[in-house]
Amino acid sequence: QVAGRAGRAETPGRVVVQTYEPDHYAIQLAAKQDYRAFYTRESAFRRACLYPPFTVIARIVFTADAEKDARAAAEAAEEKLNAYIDGAGIRRDIVQMRALEAPIRFLRNRWRWQVFLKMYFKADQEAVTRKMRDVAAETAEGVQAEMEVNPVNMI
């Protein structure tokens, strides 16, 4: 996108990319403007790693002044979601689900824990994410919850 905006009319633009991984396939293929090869390679990687668009990732991030409160909220949410998943008979469609510390545990003077869920498309995604929203809304006083589906950033 940057390269497309770099030039003006007939004048070609020039783009400089700074990276720690100049040999990475994304950089190499972008430099060659080989979008088809990039798509093929990235799709294969995403399928192998069970990343979107081949699965759905959803998470609830819990934040609180005390770490124990954020952790307790995440663990309680995990327990409720496990009960829902088992009751709905969709355990086989869930790739992974667990409560864990957020990648950045402490941000803006608040502790962060999350419930991370990855599911195949066979699962009733709308029902599962609706249940996640309900669980997020049931947090204890002093705990905030934010739910995301296929987040752009997992931090």
Map each language-model feature to its residues.
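Accessory helical-bundle/CTD segments and flexible terminal tails appended to RecA-like ATPase motors
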Residues: Q1-I155
